Amino acid sequence: MKKLHIITAALAVATLSCKKDKTSETITDEMNKSVKEVTTEKPKTILTAENFGLAESQMIFAKYVKDIAAITKTNGVGVFMHKKKAPDPKDKTVVRINFDTQYSVAILDLKEEATLTMPETNGRYQTAWFVTEEHYNPMAINKPGTYKINQQNMGSRYVMLVIRTQVNMTDPEDLAKVSALQDQLQLTQNDRGSYVITNNWDRPEVLKMREKYQKIVREKKITSSMMFGKKGETTLENHNVGVSTGWGGMTSKQAVYPNFQPKNSNPATLTLKDVPVDAFWSITVYDQGGWVNGEKFNINSSFAKPNKNGEYVINFGGDKNVANYLDTFEGWNFILRMYQPTEAYFDGSWKVPELVQE
C-alpha cells in the first residue's frame, strides 16, 4: 500500500464559488465599476519566474472580485462571500474536494487598514489564512478576537482572506450553526477601496509556465511543506511550484495530508489513536479521478466513534453496520487530513498508522 505523507493543499477557485440567486442577476453601478476596473486593458507584461506568483494571483483575485461583486452587490472588495451549502458529491468541478470546512472569502485593499473580528466558536476550528498578491502567506489567525490587517503586517496592498470553519457536512443542524458563525465574522474599513490589476498578463504564457512548474514537482518530489509560507521562507522555484500546483495552500503548521493508496479493493481498517492535532482530523475516500462515490465517504473526529480503548477504528468496505464505516470501490484511495498538527507529527514520535487490508 502506497502512502504519501504530504500532498499539496490547494484552494481552488471553484471551491469557493457561490451560485448566484435570481436577485444577483441585477447589475448595479458599483458592480459594473468593479468589473470594468479588473478588466482594463494594459500593455502586455513580460512574464518571468520572479513575477509568476503575481500573475497567477492577480488573475485569481480578479475572478473573485467579480464573483463577490455579483453576489454581494458591492464592488467586490472588503466584503465576505460565504459558502454555506454542503458541496454536491456529484459535482465534478473540484478534484479531491474538502468536506470538512465551510469557506468565507474576501479580497482586501489595504490602502487603509482593515479590522477583522472572529467570533467565539466554543472550540470549533476556525482559521483565517492570508494570501498576498505575490502568493505569500504572512500569517494565520486561529483564535477568536479582533485583529488589525494592514500593509505592514501583510507586506502587500492586496490580499485574499480565507476563513475556514469546521463543519459536519452531513448534519443540517451543524451546517446551520456554522452559517451563524460565518455571519458573525466582521470586516470593517473606513474605505474598502477597489481592486485594479496593475498588469496585463498573457494567459497562454502563464499557463505554459504553470505546466513547467507542475512538471518540476513531479521530477523533484517537492512536498507542500516546502512550497508555502512567508516571503523568504521558500526558494523561488519551490514557491512557484506551490503557485502552480496548490494555489492558496496552507503551510504544514496549519495542515498536513497523508494520502493512502490501497493495494486492492478488499475491506480494510485504519486505527487512529491520540492523533497529534490541536484542531481536528478527517478522512475522505476518493476514486482514482479524485471524486467521491457512494453515500459514506467522509468522517471526522467530531463525529467518529472511539472504542473502549480510545481508538478510532475506521472501517473501509465490508460490513456497513459497523462504526466508522466508509464505502470503497475499485480504485479507491483516501486522504487523512490533520488540521494544526502538533510537534509529535513532525518529530516522528507519532507515526502515521498503516492501513490493514485483507
Residue ranges and their predicted role:
Residues T26-E358:
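A compositional/structural signature for long, glycine/proline-rich flexible linkers
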